[in-house]
């Protein structure tokens, strides 16, 4: 039974109350849904890339909702209650960061920047600091401290992993959720929809910016990422 449909995925119940099926759609959206398109095979590519990334992170001790891949478009995941926060890590200046602070794209930051936003389309996912999140009862201080440390750890793992594939991890967003025991674990997806990935040598963008900014065929970019991950 369909439980929820988001911009890029559908969530279905299973016979096990503690497990869901995630179905990856072909829909592409940008600018909080203002730009939309359906792009054939995008969902398949995101499912395959996310599967590889969740498996890679599991090898490094990062627990996520991922259980196993079921098909080209579907994965089985643990039931989690998603926290109403998106966490963002920036290694290189790009996107909204450049617009917000008036800096050039492509500056390598001295250290990663950790950001949080309130996961709410109605308000445009506004940025939050720790005090905002605590005051709005979106998370406790201890939970925010865990999110920060876990996200920065994930950043180091993914940076090294992508670098082996000649990809720069420019920035990315993650979502976390609480499992049935109340533990906070990584959720959602890890794909070129949620990560900015540039070629190390040419800085060619192989992520959703191809769609956002009309920089080339989106599927071609995602296929290139998957091909490198499968090497």
Regions found by a protein language model. Name each.
Residues 34-44, 127-150:
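Short histidine-centered catalytic/ligand-binding loop motif
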Residues 68-73, 163-178:
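A short glycine-rich, hydrophobically flanked beta-strand micro-motif that places a catalytic Asp/Glu
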Residues 190-231:
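C-terminal helix-cap and adjacent tail motif
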């Amino acid at each position: 039974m369909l439980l929820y449909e988001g911009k890029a995925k559908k969530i279905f119940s299973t016979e096990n109350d503690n497990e869901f099926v995630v179905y990856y759609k072909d829909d592409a959206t940008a600018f909080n849904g203002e730009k939309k398109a359906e792009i054939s095979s995008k969902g398949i590519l995101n499912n395959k890339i996310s599967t590889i990334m969740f498996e890679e992170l599991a090898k490094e001790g990062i627990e996520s909702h991922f259980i196993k891949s079921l098909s080209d478009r579907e994965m089985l995941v643990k039931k989690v209650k998603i926290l109403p926060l998106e966490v963002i890590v920036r290694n290189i200046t790009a996107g909204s960061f450049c617009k917000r602070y008036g800096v050039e794209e492509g500056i390598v930051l001295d250290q990663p920047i950790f950001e949080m936003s309130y996961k709410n389309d109605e308000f445009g996912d506004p940025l939050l600091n720790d005090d905002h999140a605590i005051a709005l009862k979106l998370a406790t201080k201890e939970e925010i401290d865990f999110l920060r440390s876990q996200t920065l750890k994930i950043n180091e793992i993914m940076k090294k992993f992508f670098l082996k594939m000649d990809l720069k991890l420019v920035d990315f967003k993650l979502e976390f959720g609480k499992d049935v025991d109340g533990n906070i674990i990584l959720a959602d997806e890890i794909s070129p929809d949620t990560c900015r990935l540039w070629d190390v040598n040419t800085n060619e963008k192989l992520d959703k910016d191809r769609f956002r900014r009309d920089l080339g065929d989106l599927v071609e970019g995602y296929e290139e990422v998957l091909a490198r991950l499968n090497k």
